[in-house]
Amino acid sequence: MKSTLIILRGNSASGKTTIAKELQEHFGQGTLLVSQDVVRRDMLKVHDTIGNLSHDLLFEITKYGKGKCEFVILEGILSSRRYGDMLKELIHFFDENTFTY
């Protein structure tokens, strides 16, 4: 299965999560939604600092969707300083089959 990665980035309260959930609903069953806030705040209870535990988990969960899900949506503030290299790796991992916003 060919997987498409959709990355939604932006400021706090800009509508990323709302749009991501709407996209997941639109694409339907098997669409993986990876939310930075859920992983960082709810699952790990860590602050968004350089090197925090959520970085690696976001990366691994997102990679998990390749070949298993038609669409993988990664959403969050995902600042370039903290997550830029990870995002570039994911884009490469998904064979450039990526949309970024």
Protein language model annotation of sequence segments:
Residues L5:
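Walker A (P-loop) ATP-phosphate-binding motif of ABC ATPase nucleotide-binding domains
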Residues L8:
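Hydrophobic anchor at the beta1->P-loop junction of P-loop NTPases
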Residues N11-S12:
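The conserved Walker
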Residues I50-N97:
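Glycine-rich phosphate-binding loop used to anchor ATP phosphates in small-molecule kinases
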Residues T18-E70:
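Conserved substrate/cofactor phosphate-moiety recognition/catalytic segment
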Residues T31-L33, E96-Y101:
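Conserved beta-strand scaffold positions in the cores of enzyme catalytic domains, especially
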Residues G15:
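Conserved glycine(s) of the Walker
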Residues M1-K2:
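Basic/polar N-terminal segments that are highly enriched at the extreme N-terminus
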